[in-house]
Amino acid sequence: MPKVTVTVEHNQSIGTVVQKVTPAIEKTVTDFQGQDLSLDWQEDRADFKFKSLGFTIQGDIQVDPTSVTVNLELPFAAMIYKEKAKKGIANSVAKALAD
C-alpha cells in the first residue's frame, strides 16, 4: 500500500502534543467523510483505522520530543486522494499545535 507521511515540528511536551493531535486527527477523518475511527494511544504512539469512501485506511502517529509524524497507508484505489490527504493532515496537525 502507498504511504503518506507528514511530519510537523513542535516545541511542546509529548503529553500536550498527544492531547492536541487527537482532536485534529478526529477532525481530519470527519473532513474526509470517515467513519468508525479507532484510535489507540500507547504513551507517545498511536495506531488508527477508519473507513472513508468505501476504503479502509490505517496508519500510526509517533510523537517525538521535537516533532509529530503521521503515517497513513492508502489502498491503491485511493491514490487519487494522496495529496489531498497529506495537505489535510499537515494543516490540521499544524493548526492544532499552533493553538
Protein language model regions, located:
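A short, structured beta-strand/loop element
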Residues: 56-65
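Intrinsic-disorder/low-complexity, polar/charged segments enriched in Ser/Thr/Lys/Arg/Asp/Glu/Gln
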Residues: 1-5, 45, 67
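C-terminal structural segments of small proteins and small subunits
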Residues: 7, 65-96
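Ser/Thr-rich, low-complexity intrinsically disordered terminal regions
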Residues: 23, 30-57
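Residue-level recognition of conserved beta-strand positions in structured domain cores
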Residues: 50, 61, 72-74
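Intrinsically disordered, low-complexity acidic/polar segments
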Residues: 15, 57, 79-81
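Feature captures hydrophobic
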Residues: 4, 27, 49, 92, ...
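Terminal, regulation- and interaction-focused segments at domain boundaries
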Residues: 1-20, 24-31, 35-36
